[in-house]
């Protein structure tokens, strides 16, 4: 499709998608002049230039700081909606999962272990998923506080008084 376009049409479309990812003047720079986050946004622009039906993102936030990661997550979510495309994200970043994921599948050793949405994941009883999500004590406490808020009890044999008095 794109190969049949005349140069001015191609340039116009490239500039449109660069503008959409907030990189209006990136086409005037060398790749070495772009930050990691800018390179990720260029990658997203390249992926959407032909109006695809699917967007595949493999670890879209690898190597990025937390603020830039959040920006990339929001951009992926916005583009998914604006372009009415199905986006598939492969990631180990639970922040991205929670930010982007409408429908989440957790896999372990190539097998589906859990399926649901980003609201249900907090209440999952799948031990392997919980080990992955709530690896730190802080996150375990956050989950227990969430469970306490919604159900009046915590999810395991942890001491509720200790949790509340931390």
Identify the residue ranges that each predicted region occupies:
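Helix N-cap at the start of a conserved alpha-helix in ABC-type nucleotide-binding domains
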Residues: 66-68
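Conserved ABC ATPase "signature" region
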Residues: 7-25
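C-terminal boundary and immediately downstream tail of ABC-type ATPase nucleotide-binding domains
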Residues: 122-157
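A short, proline-enriched helix->beta-strand linker immediately N-terminal to the Walker B motif
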Residues: 49-53
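Catalytic Walker B motif of ABC-type/P-loop ATPase nucleotide-binding domains
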Residues: 55-58
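Conserved ABC ATPase signature
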Residues: 30-34, 38
């Amino acid at each position: 499709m794109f190969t049949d376009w005349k140069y001015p049409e191609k340039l116009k479309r490239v500039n449109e998608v660069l503008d959409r990812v907030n990189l209006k003047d990136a086409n005037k720079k060398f790749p070495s002049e772009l930050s990691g986050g800018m390179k990720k946004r260029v990658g997203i622009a390249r992926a959407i230039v032909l109006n695809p039906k699917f967007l595949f993102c493999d670890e879209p936030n690898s190597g990025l700081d937390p603020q830039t990661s959040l920006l990339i997550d929001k951009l992926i979510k916005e583009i998914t909606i604006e372009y009415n495309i199905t986006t598939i994200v492969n990631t180990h970043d639970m922040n991205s999962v929670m930010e982007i994921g409408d429908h989440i599948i957790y896999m372990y050793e190539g097998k589906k272990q859990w399926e649901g949405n980003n609201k249900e994941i907090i209440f999952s009883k799948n031990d392997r998923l919980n080990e992955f999500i709530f690896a730190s004590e802080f996150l375990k406490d956050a989950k227990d506080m969430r469970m306490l808020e919604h159900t009046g009890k915590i999810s395991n044999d942890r001491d509720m008084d200790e949790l509340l008095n931390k």
